[in-house]
């Protein structure tokens, strides 16, 4: 899947940031279904601003890759929608989305009064996102605080300067990020999250239990460049890593399980999933 800029007035994110446009395309397609699992009324606007999707490459491995991305993106979005909603219903009022990308949950989910939602991402991503949201006159349903920061740098200082209250419980979402980090960087990021989290804080992220997807990408010439962006994440099961670092896993669900419950197919590997943990 490739995207081209539709206008010189809005700069489209590049590199890993471009994958956020791809996920917006997945959400736009799902939102157009009569049996949709969620509704993102802004997703299509991001795709349009990027010039629209254009399929690249032959059938076969590429087609299977697109199907897996679509399935993963749909189930991931619904799972974490429910995760954030349940946290808010349980009294959590401080939320942080790391690598927020083109996430529009601040605008499309219902939030209790007093909710503060921090979106951390690169300045160019946040600028693109806001420019598109402005064209749709989008209004956030919670106090939305954008934090321009590189997650490879000292993002925690930027977050606290923006108003994060580390002594309060925080609900963290690390969505679509860890696969683009190597084991050391992924562990460092999650360790930093832990240092900013008091007991009762929550953490949600996705996990991949095998290398099928990366192997498939590397074996497909049209996708080899994208494959270089993927670093593998933690390198071990988060079900083992989290308990050693002060977290208790509350929920871990495979994509295939969620898809079956929704009456949807689950193409590709069956070992990817999503989890929620709480700080001990």
Curated annotation (Swiss-Prot):
S-adenosyl-L-methionine binds at residues 121, 150-151. GO terms for molecular function: methyltransferase activity. Its EC number is 2.1.1.-. It comes from the Bacteria. One of its GO terms (biological process) is methylation. InterPro entries: Ppm1/Ppm2/Tcmp, SAM-dependent_MTases_sf, SAM_mthyl_Trfase_ML2640-like. It is an enzyme of class 2 (transferase). Exhibits S-adenosyl-L-methionine-dependent methyltransferase activity. NCBIfam families: mthyl_TIGR00027. Belongs to the UPF0677 family. PANTHER family: S-ADENOSYL-L-METHIONINE-DEPENDENT METHYLTRANSFERASE YKTD-RELATED, S-ADENOSYL-L-METHIONINE-DEPENDENT METHYLTRANSFERASES SUPERFAMILY PROTEIN. This is Putative S-adenosyl-L-methionine-dependent methyltransferase FRAAL3836. The lineage of its organism: Bacteria, Bacillati, Actinomycetota, Actinomycetes, Frankiales.
């Amino acid at each position: 899947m490739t995207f081209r800029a539709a206008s010189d007035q809005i700069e489209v994110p590049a590199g890993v940031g471009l994958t956020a446009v791809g996920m917006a395309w997945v959400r736009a397609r799902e939102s157009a279904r009569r049996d949709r699992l969620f509704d993102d009324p802004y997703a299509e606007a991001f795709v349009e601003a990027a010039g629209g999707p254009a399929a690249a490459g032959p059938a076969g491995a590429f087609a299977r890759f697109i199907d897996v991305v679509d399935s993963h993106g749909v189930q991931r979005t619904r799972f974490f929608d429910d995760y954030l909603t349940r946290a808010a219903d349980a009294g959590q009022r401080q939320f942080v989305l790391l690598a927020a990308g083109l996430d529009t949950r601040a605008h499309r989910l219902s939030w209790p009064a007093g909710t503060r939602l921090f979106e951390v991402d690169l300045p160019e991503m946040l600028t693109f996102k806001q420019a598109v949201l402005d064209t749709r006159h989008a209004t956030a349903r919670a106090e939305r605080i954008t934090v321009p920061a590189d997650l490879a740098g000292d993002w925690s200082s930027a977050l606290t300067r923006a108003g994060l209250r580390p002594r309060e419980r925080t609900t963290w979402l690390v969505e679509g990020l860890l696969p683009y980090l190597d084991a050391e960087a992924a562990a460092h990021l999650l360790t930093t999250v832990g240092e900013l989290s008091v007991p009762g804080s929550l953490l949600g992220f996705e996990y991949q239990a095998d290398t099928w997807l990366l192997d498939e990408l590397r074996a497909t010439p049209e996708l080899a460049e994208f494959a270089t962006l993927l670093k593998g994440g933690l390198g071990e099961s988060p079900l083992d890593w989290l308990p050693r670092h002060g977290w208790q896993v509350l929920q871990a669900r495979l994509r295939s399980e969620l898809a079956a419950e929704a009456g949807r197919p689950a193409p590709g590997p069956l070992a990817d999933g999503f989890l929620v943990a709480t700080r001990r």
